[in-house]
Amino acid sequence: MFHATTILAYKGKNKSVIGGDGQVSFGNTVLKGNAIKIRKLNNGKVLAGFAGSTADAFNLFDMFENLLQSSKGDLLKAAIDFSKEWRKDKYLRKLEAMMLVLDRNHIFLLSGTGDVVEPEDGQIAAIGSGGNYALSAARALAKHANLDEEELVKSSLQIAGEICIYTNTNIKTYVIEDEK
């Protein structure tokens, strides 16, 4: 498991949201508390976030963004092509990072081994050291609270930040709303 972050993605009825905390840790030391580990891709139609080695994650972001462009914004095709490229490249197989990517139709976890996983419920996924805390909170809030999608993500990450020592409560979110 990667120590240093928590990323949570939620594909709700009206919005898709990704959020992340701002903490960067090196061993037992907090280096930075306001890092941004999420991005908008494909003119804001795809959201992505990473956990793991920052340098590795930037390489993965660039590679994924290129595949997303070559697939004309088709997230499913880009995720599959990403996995194929990852498996073929010996250098990529050694990268220590994970990504969450989502749009209004799909949500995928791209693992450090080149796997592409769509969550069983198709709605909520989390990565990073506080990922399981955020995932648990998000599932409970989705089931029992009447929160807007962005508030659900923020509240879940807040809970993770209060529990996980590698996660803080400096939360940043990006949202994709249904076109009206």
Swiss-Prot record:
InterPro entries: ATP-dep_Prtase_HsIV_su (IPR022281), Ntn_hydrolases_N (IPR029055), Proteasome_sua/b (IPR001353), Proteasome_suB-type (IPR023333). Keywords: Allosteric enzyme, Cytoplasm, Hydrolase, Metal-binding, Protease, Sodium, Threonine protease. Allosterically activated by HslU binding. One of its GO terms (biological process) is proteolysis involved in protein catabolic process. The keyword Metal-binding applies. It comes from the Bacteria. A double ring-shaped homohexamer of HslV is capped on each side by a ring-shaped HslU homohexamer. The assembly of the HslU/HslV complex is dependent on binding of ATP. This is ATP-dependent protease subunit HslV. The gene is hslV.
